[in-house]
């Protein structure tokens, strides 16, 4: 009789369990996302099923029915080596946890991260998570044949997502005001997620920091603000400078200790510079001057072929003066790198004159600007005859960088005057010489993702160059 009562109670309890709770009970480390709460993961007819899955110590991988029992046996264009994918995922996990310290173990809930492999020829690569509980990514075969930096990038997004989850575990309110779950304007967008995920992926694939596509875009767009939407996949160089000077934990601290409404660089200022804006611009100019020759330890094995590529455009405005082009004008926190043809000279003097926002462009400057989500030719549809008339008191930092034939760099002192002249004795064996100008307005300017270049804070200027032999 007692046994019957126990069996009846057990059956009653089982009858009240949802598919999610049954699956979680049967599969330790599995958390069933709320959006799939009604799905039976133990049913092979479900879109996602343990009948079509594989797992490693820290990841669960599910694939759609089109792959059948094993994606490795699919048609060549859909074939995926799931063992390789999981092995690489474990390495990317270790990079983010053990080296970058993006999350503490155990992760929220102690659950495994989840990978969902879609049966589609389209390019699908999205990383984030579910329910402020687990990291998850959704991918297609084209992104993992074999698994590489794309998967590292998306797992980087998972750990960005998890910074907020761990803040909640530590008692933070669930108000999307930590872990950069917030944007800097009404559209709730910020470029940090993509910039950061690129840098995180290059930790596993450092040689890919220099690729033709990324570098072509970078050399055209580097003058933009640090979190500009148009360089959201290329503006990762700042994090090399940051972590080289302050350690790898500086990157994860910015994510994990962010506070609304700060952007990443305001968080950096608070954590490391006591909110001193001048100290920030000093650090930023140091970064810009080093970025001109990619003078970062991690970049050293790969940078030689990319020297001498910066080429800011200027237009003559009379009496030897040249005015920076609209398309090369440094935005707030961005920089311009002007190559100087130093042949036969041993000293250069540059007269500098800062201009007000809204000043007239040079006559020959076409004044075209981008309107749209990306800086592509079809989006170059705006036209203006003035620099952007934003409400920002302008400021600058500027100086010289010499790159010698043996790879040595020589840096001048930095100047911050609105108008003045600076000189530099050109070292022997100088191969490339640059005049570098940083946009450093008197008050910090948060960059808003608005898909309209004409709204960006520009710091225009003009220069006159004189040589002595």
Question: What residue spans do the PLM features occupy?
Answer:
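Sec-dependent N-terminal signal peptides of Gram-positive bacterial secreted proteins and lipoproteins
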Residues: 4-20
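Zn2+-dependent metallopeptidase catalytic core
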Residues: 24-134, 141-155, 159-169, 399-401
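Second-shell loop/turn segments in exported
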Residues: 71-84, 138-146, 180-187, 222-229, ...
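Stable alpha-helical elements in mature extracytoplasmic
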Residues: 81, 85-92, 147, 151-155, ...
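Sec-exported extracytoplasmic/periplasmic mature domains
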Residues: 93-102, 157-164, 202-206, 243-248, ...
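Zinc-dependent metallopeptidase catalytic helix centered on the HExxH motif
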Residues: 136-212, 216
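Active-site-proximal alpha-helical
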Residues: 217-294
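Beta/coil-rich, acidic/histidine-enriched accessory regions frequently appended to metallopeptidases
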Residues: 262-469
């Amino acid at each position: 009789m007692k046994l019957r009562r126990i069996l009846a109670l057990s059956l009653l309890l089982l009858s009240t369990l949802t598919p999610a709770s049954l699956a979680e009970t049967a599969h330790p480390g599995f958390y069933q996302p709320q959006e799939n709460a009604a799905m039976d993961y133990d049913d092979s007819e479900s879109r996602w099923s343990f009948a079509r899955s594989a797992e490693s110590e820290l990841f669960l991988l599910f694939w759609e029915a089109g792959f059948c029992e094993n994606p490795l046996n699919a048609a060549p264009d859909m074939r995926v080596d799931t063992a390789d994918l999981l092995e690489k995922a474990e390495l990317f996990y270790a990079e983010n946890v053990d080296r970058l310290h993006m999350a503490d173990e155990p992760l929220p809930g102690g659950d495994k991260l989840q990978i969902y492999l879609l049966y589609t020829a389209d390019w699908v690569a999205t990383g984030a998570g579910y329910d402020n509980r687990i990291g998850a990514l959704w991918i297609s075969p084209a992104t993992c044949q074999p698994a590489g930096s794309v998967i590292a990038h998306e797992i980087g997004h998972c750990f960005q997502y998890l910074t907020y989850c761990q803040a909640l575990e530590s008692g933070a309110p669930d108000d999307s005001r930590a872990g950069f779950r917030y944007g800097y304007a009404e559209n709730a967008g910020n470029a940090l997620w993509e910039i950061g995920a690129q840098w995180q992926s290059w930790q596993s694939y450092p040689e890919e920091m220099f690729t033709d596509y990324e570098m072509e875009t970078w050399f055209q767009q580097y003058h933009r603000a640090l979190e500009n939407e148009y360089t959201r996949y290329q503006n990762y160089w700042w994090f090399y400078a940051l972590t080289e000077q302050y350690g790898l934990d500086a990157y994860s601290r910015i994510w994990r200790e962010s506070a609304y409404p700060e952007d990443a660089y305001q968080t950096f200022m608070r954590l490391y510079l006591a909110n001193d804006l001048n100290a920030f611009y000093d650090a930023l100019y140091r970064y810009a001057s080093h970025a001109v020759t990619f003078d970062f330890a991690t970049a050293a094995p790969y940078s030689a072929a990319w020297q001498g590529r910066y080429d800011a455009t200027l237009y003559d405005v009379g009496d030897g003066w040249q005015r920076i082009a609209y398309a090369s004008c440094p935005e707030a926190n961005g920089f311009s790198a002007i190559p100087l043809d130093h042949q036969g000279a041993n000293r250069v003097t540059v007269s500098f004159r800062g201009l007000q926002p809204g000043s007239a462009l040079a006559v020959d400057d076409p004044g075209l600007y981008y309107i749209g989500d990306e800086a592509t030719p079809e989006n170059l549809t705006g036209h203006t005859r003035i620099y952007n008339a934003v409400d920002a008191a302008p400021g600058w930092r500027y100086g010289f960088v010499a790159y010698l034939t043996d790879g040595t760099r020589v840096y001048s002192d930095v100047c911050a005057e609105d108008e003045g002249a600076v000189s530099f004795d050109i070292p022997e064996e100088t191969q490339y010489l640059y005049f570098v100008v940083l946009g450093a307005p008197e008050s910090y300017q948060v960059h808003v993702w608005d898909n309209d270049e004409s709204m960006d804070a520009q710091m225009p200027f003009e220069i006159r160059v004189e040589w002595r032999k």
